[in-house]
Amino acid sequence: MSEKTTPSINELLDREAIRNLIISFNALGDRGRVAEMIQVFAPDATLKAVGQTAVGRADIATLLQANPLLPDHQVTRHHIGTQTVEISGDEAVARSYFSVLTNIGLDHHGVYIDHFRRQPGGAWLIVEREVRLDWQAANSVYAPLPVHDRARPQVSAGFPKMPNA
């Protein structure tokens, strides 16, 4: 939150709009509705996931459709947990922990690191998303996915990030 002790109504509305984008992405993905999923991204957005990078909605759709699909009769449900949203003017950054449940139970979990920009009409869209996978079950229904190496600290702006970040 900003230095203010009480957020404004507009800031609260912005936070809720951003959270709704994150949740919508997962709900649509669980139903396989890729054409609608990509609408949460700005036209020139970047998605970094499963060791690949896609730029623009068309490439993002291709990446999402190319991911290992669940076998027939499998169920997948993405759940958002702890979440932070920091807003600065017309830009925002969110970190959202996620867990994915399938027919085996907990299948994998990680964090979304999202950058948002308010569009000219006032709507928020994702301009960059990094999907960082922290763990995947040995019996996952998905093909093996690249898991983030939490043992190596990441360096950003000259300061090492905490290994557990």
What is each model feature region?
Residues 1-35, 39, 43:
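Short, low-complexity N-terminal intrinsically disordered segments enriched in polar/charged residues
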Residues 93, 111-145:
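Short beta-strand edge/turn micro-motifs at domain boundaries
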Residues 55, 100-102, 132-133:
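Short, surface-exposed beta-strand-loop junctions and turns on beta-sheet-rich folds
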Residues 137-165:
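Acidic/histidine-enriched, glycine/proline-rich intrinsically disordered or flexible terminal extensions
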Residues 80-85, 100, 111-118:
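Hydrophobic/aromatic beta-strand elements that line small-molecule binding cavities or substrate pockets
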Residues 15, 24-28, 94-99, 104-109:
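A structural preference for long, well-packed, hydrophobic secondary-structure segments
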Residues 34-98:
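A solvent-exposed, acidic/Ser-Thr-rich amphipathic alpha-helical stretch
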Residues 18, 68, 87-93, 100, ...:
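A structural signal for the main folded, soluble domain(s) of proteins
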